[in-house]
Amino acid sequence: MKKLVLSIIAGLALMLGLTNVVQADEYLRIGMEAAYAPFNWTQDDDSNGAVKIDGTNQYANGYDVQIAKKIAKDLGKEPLVVKTKWEGLVPALTSGKIDMIIAGMSPTAERKQEIAFSSSYYTSEPVLLVKKDSAYANAKTLDDFKDAKITSQQGVYLYDLISQIPGAKKETAMGDF
């Protein structure tokens, strides 16, 4: 009797395990913050081509989401967004929780040691944003930012660039704005 029960349990475990593999294969799990418009954001419905966010009643949309849909379609899979904090994206990928990151992540040397990058689908140049009426509104060169308090988003390569601005005061990186 004990062997029969163990056999049934083992069989069920095997079937459940295979079910998870089949389910995992039908989806392309894409990691992104879903909080960085216009690239990706969270919304309450599937309007305008939004994609379901795993484990929630919400949907993600934006430029990154549309790219994800195209890639998933080309692979014959359904896209599924896995909403992940920025600092958790690389660990989620390396652990297998997600299949890919689509989040405007720059291919830094440090990141390239852990993960592979595709060709860029979007490029941009770093810029400094200032208030219209600030003392730096008419700045033309980096030297014009002497004594300016400057920061960036936490965990992005732009934060390291601040030290290249002569005389700027590098503030603590921001988790959100």
Predicted regions and their residues:
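Acidic, polar ligand-binding/catalytic clefts
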Residues: 78-144, 155
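Bilobed "Venus flytrap"/periplasmic-binding protein-like clamshell domains
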Residues: 34-37, 57-73, 127-177
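Short glycine-/acidic-enriched loop or helix-start segments at secondary-structure transitions
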Residues: 40-42, 112-113, 161-162
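Short capping/connector residues at structural and topological boundaries
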Residues: 41-44, 120-122, 126, 150
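Bacterial N-terminal signal peptides
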Residues: 7-17
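Sec/Tat signal peptide C-region and signal peptidase I cleavage site
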Residues: 18-24
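Extracytoplasmic small-molecule ligand-binding "clamshell" domains
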Residues: 25-104
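Positively charged n-region of N-terminal signal peptides that target proteins for export
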Residues: 1-5
